[in-house]
Design a protein with these regions (language model features):
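Amphipathic, Lys/Arg-enriched alpha-helical "gate/interface" segment within cytosolic domains
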Residues: 1-126
Length: 126
């Protein structure tokens, strides 16, 4: 499965990484595993690293379902890190959904890891 996560409980951060071809079912399974992990706290921040994704098989409706799950709390922030028009475009869709439904900036898209970490307040992490 081309999705994994690491929970950094010390810093309150989940780093989700995806690579190669990623499908809706794989993203959904990733969220299920994360939500069931005893180390997970919905208030943690998240960095989604999709820089190595080559093909994203997630429709707009499926992306809405993914975001609609609310795995993370309303207090959480998510930085989506990607490369390429399709991947960044999907990130922008999620960013717009968050702004529309939550009325605040809880998701932001980046192409630079250090800028993403800084936005999350984690600029001192490698």
């Amino acid at each position: 499965m081309p999705c994994r996560y690491v929970i950094d409980t010390e810093h309150g951060l989940v780093i989700s990484t995806a690579w190669d071809r990623v499908t809706f079912d794989e993203v959904n399974a990733h969220q299920n595993r994360l939500a069931e992990d005893p180390s997970f706290d919905p208030d943690f921040k998240q960095l989604v690293d999709a820089t190595k994704v080559t093909d994203l098989e997630v429709s707009i409706e499926e992306a809405k379902k993914i975001f609609g799950r609310k795995t993370f709390s309303a207090a959480s922030r998510c930085a989506f890190l990607g490369k390429g028009l399709v991947i960044l475009g999907m990130g922008r869709l999620i960013e717009a959904q968050a702004a529309l439904f939550e009325g605040r900036e809880s998701v932001r898209v980046f192409s630079d890891r250090q800028k993403a970490l800084k936005w999350l307040g984690m600029e001192n992490l490698p």
